[in-house]
């Protein structure tokens, strides 16, 4: 797969293009230019490290949306075995923007649920661009209740711009479906680990995001609204998205500092999209550690702590009047 570079990665793209050109020349000639290729590769790695060390919030949001990042089904293939996908909400339809089913993680049975985006135009439309409708959240809820019945830990993967705002979705009870999930997830008597792997967009993310631990990838985001949406409301222009991104505090480090996430999972150099295998290894370590920790907790203590976590969302302090 040819790497897609973002706007701020253009210096890296130019170096990588030069490296590819030299590889082509080397294959078609007797010249040995391997040393020059290695030099440029080191330069590219150093440049990537330098650029990614200075990313602002708006640039991080662009990385979180990168079209080549692993999606839920990719993590399922890379981390789990014996996956059996379960379909439908048993009330209206099967929403392809939410995928889920039973699987084994390190040999132990679990329930996996997550948002799913598409790669090409046809799949994006089929997956509704990762924006679930009410039936998607009701499907997720059905699987969670099934997990509780069989005492299966629940692992959710969050990556959505938000819940689908269409008229049909609203008529079928979008807000009720999200609220119902929050209500039920707060009381499920089984461990829940939520991992933000891309965009964590508003209630669409929170509807499968109430858990005992919330993990986030280094270059993922979590927010009540997209930077563009916030800018359009406050400044009447999406051009202020970069300002909105900084103000919203959507990045992993800000979220960790505010107590909204528990652990930041380090991504490979250049983001998860650059090395899926390395990302899967980091994810496996994080999930293994987190599940081992939760299994030691008594159920009542776990539920009490989970409820307090949910209640703490949106807490604030009043500043002195000026």
Swiss-Prot record:
GO BP of this protein: fatty acid biosynthetic process; malonyl-CoA biosynthetic process
UniProt GO molecular function: acetyl-CoA carboxylase activity; ATP binding; carboxyl- or carbamoyltransferase activity
Reaction it catalyzes: N(6)-carboxybiotinyl-L-lysyl-[protein] + acetyl-CoA = N(6)-biotinyl-L-lysyl-[protein] + malonyl-CoA
Enzyme class: transferase
Main subcellular location: cytoplasm
Residue span, CoA carboxyltransferase C-terminal domain: 39-293
Gene3D superfamilies: 2-enoyl-CoA Hydratase, Chain A, domain 1
Pathway: Lipid metabolism; malonyl-CoA biosynthesis; malonyl-CoA from acetyl-CoA: step 1/1
Assigned EC number: 2.1.3.15
Gene Ontology CC terms: acetyl-CoA carboxylase complex
InterPro entries with a match to the protein in the record: Acetyl_CoA_COase_a_su, ClpP/crotonase-like_dom_sf, COA_CT_C
Disulfide-bond pairs as recorded: none
Protein's cellular compartments: Cytoplasm
UniProt KW keywords: ATP-binding, Cytoplasm, Fatty acid biosynthesis, Fatty acid metabolism, Lipid biosynthesis, Lipid metabolism, Nucleotide-binding, Transferase
Similarity comment: family membership: Belongs to the AccA family.
HAMAP family for the chain: AcetylCoA_CT_alpha
UniProt subunit comment: Acetyl-CoA carboxylase is a heterohexamer composed of biotin carboxyl carrier protein (AccB), biotin carboxylase (AccC) and two subunits each of ACCase subunit alpha (AccA) and ACCase subunit beta (AccD).
Functional description taken from the UniProt entry: Component of the acetyl coenzyme A carboxylase (ACC) complex. First, biotin carboxylase catalyzes the carboxylation of biotin on its carrier protein (BCCP) and then the CO(2) group is transferred by the carboxyltransferase to acetyl-CoA to form malonyl-CoA.
Name the UniProt record assigns to this protein: Acetyl-coenzyme A carboxylase carboxyl transferase subunit alpha
Gene: accA
